[in-house]
A protein has these predicted regions:
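Conserved small/polar residues in nucleotide/adenosyl-binding loops
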Residues: 385-387
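Extended, Lys/Arg-enriched charged tracts that mediate electrostatic binding to polyanionic substrates
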Residues: 144-223
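C-terminal/domain-terminus segments
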Residues: 337, 347-373
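N-terminal low-complexity, Ser/Thr- and acidic-residue-enriched intrinsically disordered segments
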Residues: 1-172
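A general structural signal for short secondary-structure junctions and capping/turn motifs
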Residues: 157, 184-189, 197-204, 232-234, ...
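Acyl-donor binding region in acyl/amide transferases
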Residues: 228-345
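A structural signal for short, well-ordered beta-strand segments and their strand-loop junctions
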Residues: 196, 211, 279-285, 349
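Flexible loop/turn segments at secondary-structure boundaries
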Residues: 219-220, 250-252, 287-292, 356-358, ...
């Protein structure tokens, strides 16, 4: 049994134990949500705390959006800093809102970590400034709970359990996976690989994954990477690893940068396995390019809309978009570029007609970019950014 399978088995055993404890009863389980909060916060027993927390999470998840807003605002009013100190001095630092401890206790319930991630996702979707503090405080907690040292890197292949493969199809954010044949083409061949980070408490749901093409040199279009009828190569012949799709899986974890650690760990692992690999690069979309042209180069934008934009004009605008910045922090205009440059990569090449899909044409008129991860200098590049 693999290490990862052991994690899943341990988590499932813990869930079954909690279900057995729940059936024994630990006092009244209040259907009044505010009383249910009091039960979670006032109990001192480890097992009873888990049972009360599980019950409260069920109540929270059953609330509609208006009910959730009311519950959270009541929580702010009743459990804010410097209030109820007497009741909670044993379970929290006095300078911290009491409801932070509530979330810590909810995290201990069955599948609590995942459910709190989904709760933050809901809170963000409400777009209520009064609830911003919950978004920020949960993010702070998640940065501890999802520390990279806790994460497990797993290779995803065609033999991976179907429930996880379904998640890969669902979460793919860059190049849509339209069928199981499409997925198989990205996972089964020896020159195509996929890696994901998992959290031990969310073992059946990836946090982020990257798809990798092993090639000879850098192709000029994404279609040469993802087409079903492409020519496969022997893995020993590859000299280049191309990270062509990176997908974050949970909106409730926005603000936590897993990608930096994922790419570098995968690159180093591949280099150990395949010493002949000498290039590690991305094949990246330019999701903001057309919007940028509409504002900063409107004549070129109109020509593109009319399909009358020449290559030289496109390249000139793309270079400006990717290398100049209208941002106060001086980082690249393009969000994908910011991510990779922020990780220590450097812009290597701009490719015309690289993504001729409807999505590729609408967001960047088919242009894509390569960002090079030079493992020898990537950390040095990163340090220069933060000087």
């Amino acid at each position: 049994m693999s290490f990862f399978q052991n994690i899943i088995t341990s988590v499932m055993k813990g869930t079954r134990r909690l279900n057995r404890f729940r059936s024994k009863g630990f006092g009244k389980l209040h259907n009044n949500i505010n009383k249910a909060v009091d039960s979670v916060m006032s109990t001192s027993g480890e097992v009873s705390s888990l049972v009360f927390a599980e019950h409260l999470l069920n109540l929270i998840e059953d609330l509609d959006d208006n009910g959730l807003k009311k519950f959270l605002k009541d929580l702010l009013k009743n459990y804010s800093s410097n209030k109820n100190t007497e009741n909670f001095e044993k379970i929290r630092i006095s300078s911290e809102p009491g409801w932070i401890e509530l979330f810590r206790r909810l995290n201990s319930s069955s599948n609590g970590t995942y459910r709190l991630v989904k709760l933050r996702e809901r809170i963000r979707s409400l777009n209520d400034e009064d609830l911003k503090t919950f978004d920020l405080r949960l993010l702070k907690l998640f940065k501890y709970w999802f520390n990279p040292s806790f994460l497990v890197l797993e290779k995803i292949d065609w033999e991976t359990p179907a429930n996880i493969l379904e998640k890969i199809i669902e979460y793919e954010a860059v190049h849509e996976i339209n069928s199981w044949d499409d997925l198989r083409a990205r996972l089964a061949p020896v020159d195509r690989q996929c890696f994901a980070f998992f959290h031990p408490l969310i073992p059946n749901d990836p946090l982020i994954f990257v798809e990798v093409a092993l090639t000879t040199g850098i192709p000029k279009s994404i279609q040469k990477i993802i087409n079903l009828d492409r020519q496969e190569i022997e893995i020993e012949d590859a000299n280049t690893a191309i990270f062509y799709s990176i997908s974050n899986c949970h909106n409730g974890l926005l603000g936590i940068s897993f990608g930096n650690f994922l790419i570098k760990q995968v690159a180093n692992n591949l280099k150990r396995e395949l010493p002949d690999l000498n290039q590690f690069t991305t094949f990246s979309p330019l999701p903001g390019f057309m919007k940028w042209m509409e504002e900063y180069s409107p004549i070129s934008f109109e020509r593109c809309i009319e399909k009358n934009c020449d290559d030289e004009e496109l390249i000139k605008n793309a270079v400006k978009y990717l290398t100049k910045s209208e941002r106060k922090d001086g980082m690249p205009n393009d969000p994908v570029g910011r991510f990779h440059v922020g990780n220590g990569a450097s812009l290597e090449r701009i490719n015309l007609n690289a993504d001729m899909s409807a999505k590729g044409l609408s967001q960047s008129y088919g242009i894509m970019a390569n960002y090079m991860y030079d493992l020898a200098v990537v950390e040095q590049n990163l340090s220069l950014i933060h000087i």
